[in-house]
Amino acid sequence: MTRSLKKGPFVDHHLVAKADKAVATKDKKPIKTWSRRSMVLPDFIGLTIAVHNGKQHVPVYITDQMVGHKLGEFALTRTFKGHPADKKVQKK
C-alpha cells in the first residue's frame, strides 16, 4: 500500500535542515544520514548524501531521476557472494 497523497512525503527534519544549510553555503561535503526511510526531495538534487547501510555510509549523488524514491533504495544492505558451485563429480 502506498502513502496517502494528503500526508505528503516523509523526510526527517534534521536531513532537510542539513540539506538547506549545504545548499546555502554551497558545501560539497557529503551529508551523513542514518535515515534510509526519508524520501528524496527536489531540493536534494546535486547533493551527495552518505546513506548508512548497516556497516558503513555509502555516498549517493542525487539526480533528478531519484526524486520520489527513498534513500535506502540506493544503499544496498546485503552483499550477494553467488550461489555455491556444484561440487558433484560429473561422470564422463
Swiss-Prot record:
This is Small ribosomal subunit protein uS19. Pfam families: Ribosomal_S19. GO terms for biological process: ribosomal small subunit assembly; translation. Belongs to the universal ribosomal protein uS19 family. One of its GO terms (cellular component) is small ribosomal subunit. It comes from the Bacteria. One of its GO terms (molecular function) is rRNA binding. PROSITE patterns: RIBOSOMAL_S19 (PS00323). Keywords: Ribonucleoprotein, Ribosomal protein, RNA-binding, rRNA-binding. It comes from Albidiferax ferrireducens (strain ATCC BAA-621 / DSM 15236 / T118) (Rhodoferax ferrireducens). SUPFAM superfamilies: Ribosomal protein S19. PANTHER family: RIBOSOMAL PROTEIN S19P FAMILY MEMBER, SMALL RIBOSOMAL SUBUNIT PROTEIN US19M. Protein S19 forms a complex with S13 that binds strongly to the 16S ribosomal RNA. InterPro entries: Ribosomal_uS19 (IPR002222), Ribosomal_uS19_bac-type (IPR005732), Ribosomal_uS19_CS (IPR020934), Ribosomal_uS19_SF (IPR023575). The keyword Ribonucleoprotein applies.
